C-alpha cells in the first residue's frame, strides 16, 4: 500500500490573496476584479441630453465678437456645456465642444495642446488654419483635424466673421 501524505493546501481565498500581493508588487492588477466597474452592463453617464440651436446661439456669439477682443479672449469660444456638467466646460464626460468666432483681420496665435482637435466650419469665408506651418483655407462644411501637440494657428483674412465648431478630447486627456 502506498502512503498518502496529508498536506494542507491553503484555502482558495488565501491563495488568491497571496497571488494578488505578488502581482501588486510588480505593478499589476487583475482585470477580472474591476471589469464590472470599468465596463458596466448599463450606462452610468452623468451627463444629460441637451440640444443647442445655432440660430439662437449665433447672435450671442456675434455679441461676444463686439464685447470681447481677440487679444483678450485669445480664442473667442462659447462652450457647449452639458447642463448636468456645469463648471466642467464639457459636453460629455469625455468631450469638449464649443463654437469659435474669428472676426475679419484676427489671428489666434500659434499654440499647441495635448488634446486632439476637430473643426467643422459652420459659416463664413476667408479664414484659415495652419498646422506646422501648412495653411489650409476653411470653407463652409469643411471638417479639419489637428493632431495633438502640433503647432497650429487660425486667422481670418476675409471680410466676414467665420464660425466653426471645435471638438476636443480635452476632458479625456486632462
Locations of regions flagged by a protein language model:
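A short hydrophobic beta-strand segment most commonly corresponding to one strand
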Residues: 100, 118-120, 145, 158-174
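A short beta-strand-loop-beta hairpin characteristic of the jelly-roll/cupin
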Residues: 103-140, 146-150
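A short glycine-rich, His/Asp/Glu-containing loop-to-beta-strand
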Residues: 66-104
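Hydrophobic or amphipathic alpha-helical targeting/insertion segments
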Residues: 151-154, 163
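Short histidine-centered beta-strand/loop micro-motifs
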Residues: 88-91, 107-113, 156
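Transition-metal
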Residues: 1-82
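A general structural signal for short secondary-structure junctions and capping/turn motifs
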Residues: 68-71, 137, 154-157
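A structural feature that tracks compact, well-ordered secondary-structure segments
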Residues: 97-100, 127-129, 155, 167
Amino acid at each position: 500500500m502506498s502512503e498518502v501524505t496529508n498536506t494542507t493546501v491553503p484555502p482558495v481565498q488565501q491563495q488568491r490573496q497571496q497571488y494578488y500581493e505578488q502581482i501588486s508588487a510588480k505593478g499589476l492588477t487583475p482585470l477580472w476584479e474591476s471589469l464590472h466597474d470599468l465596463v458596466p452592463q448599463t450606462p452610468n453617464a452623468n451627463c444629460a441630453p441637451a440640444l443647442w440651436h445655432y440660430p439662437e446661439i449665433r447672435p450671442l456669439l456675434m455679441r461676444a465678437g463686439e464685447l470681447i477682443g481677440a487679444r483678450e479672449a485669445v480664442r473667442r469660444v462659447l462652450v457647449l456645456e452639458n447642463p448636468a456638467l456645469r463648471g466642467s466646460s464639457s459636453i460629455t464626460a469625455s468631450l469638449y465642444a464649443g463654437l469659435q468666432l474669428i472676426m475679419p483681420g484676427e489671428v489666434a496665435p500659434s499654440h499647441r495642446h495635448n488634446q486632439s482637435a476637430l473643426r467643422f466650419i459652420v459659416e463664413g469665408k476667408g479664414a484659415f488654419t495652419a498646422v506646422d506651418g501648412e495653411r489650409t483655407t476653411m470653407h463652409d462644411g469643411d471638417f479639419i483635424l489637428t493632431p495633438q501637440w502640433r503647432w497650429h494657428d487660425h486667422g481670418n483674412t476675409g471680410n466676414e466673421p467665420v464660425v466653426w465648431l471645435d471638438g476636443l478630447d480635452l476632458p479625456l486627456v486632462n
